[in-house]
Curated annotation (Swiss-Prot):
Main location: membrane
A single cellular component GO annotation: plasma membrane
Protein source organism: Yersinia enterocolitica serotype O:8 / biotype 1B (strain NCTC 13174 / 8081)
Subcellular location: Cell inner membrane
Family matches, as HAMAP family: ArgO (MF_01901)
Family under the similarity heading: Belongs to the LysE/ArgO transporter (TC 2.A.75) family.
UniProt KW keywords: Amino-acid transport, Cell inner membrane, Cell membrane, Membrane, Transmembrane, Transmembrane helix, Transport
Function as written in the Swiss-Prot or TrEMBL entry: Involved in the export of arginine. Important to control the intracellular level of arginine and the correct balance between arginine and lysine.
Membrane topology designation: Multi-pass membrane protein
Name listed for the protein in its UniProt record: Arginine exporter protein ArgO
Transmembrane segments: 1-21, 42-62, 67-87, 111-131, 147-167, 182-202
Length: 205
């Protein structure tokens, strides 16, 4: 059981750790010290739902529909290109806040809506949870499959809360204009890199 748990934990961590829209959003809220723990909680809850759905049946549905998989892939390409463009433009203009959210103080509900959009309207999330985690978890025996899901979920929860708390702790340094420009450049570059990788996968479908 422990080996299966660690397998799920390691695989989930490998996909979550690279910078993506969710990470950029949570990091930005941590830097601003604005509802950062709530943001981490919503990201973790969304991942729990998506990971469990992928491992316990959603992956088979996606894999049986090449058209749906293609739509998810190319939707992810478009989303990531748009998101990366916003980050690069923020870096070019020298905005003092990350492109993950608009500048200025936001209300709790606006943060919730933005975070849900960043998570649930990002098709790359479905590729990670349904195609990768779902395909591998779905091949396991039914009695050990929950342990794989538990490991994957644990990695997600631990990462988002660690990221939010670390960003809040480093806020005095990361909230400077120069640091924000570097962050925006990094976010934009990574988003476009992931988009081009997804496009290559889409051409091979």
């Amino acid at each position: 059981m422990l080996a299966v748990f660690l397998q799920g934990f390691a695989l989930s961590a490998a996909m979550i750790l690279p910078l993506g829209p969710q990470n950029a959003f949570v990091m930005n809220q941590g830097i601003k010290r604005q509802h950062h723990l709530m943001s981490a909680s919503l990201c973790a809850l969304s991942d729990i739902i998506l990971i469990c759905a992928g491992i316990f049946g959603g992956s088979a549905l996606l894999n049986r529909s090449p058209l749906l998989l293609a739509l998810v892939t190319w939707g992810g390409v478009a989303f990531l290109l748009w998101y990366g463009w916003g980050a690069l433009m923020a870096a070019w203009r020298g905005d003092s806040s990350s492109a993950a959210v608009a500048a200025g103080t936001q209300g709790r509900w606006r943060i919730i809506v933005t975070l849900l959009a960043v998570t649930w309207l990002n098709p790359h999330v479905y590729l990670d949870t349904f195609v990768v985690l779902g395909s591998l978890g779905g091949q396991l025996l039914p009695d050990v499959r929950p342990w794989f899901a538990f490991g994957a979920v644990s990695a997600s929860v631990a990462w988002f809360f660690a990221l939010a708390l670390l960003a809040a702790w480093l806020s005095p340094w990361l909230n400077r204009p120069g640091s924000q420009r570097v962050i925006n450049l990094l976010v934009g570059g990574v988003m476009w890199f992931i988009a081009f990788q997804l496009a290559r996968q889409g051409l091979n479908l």
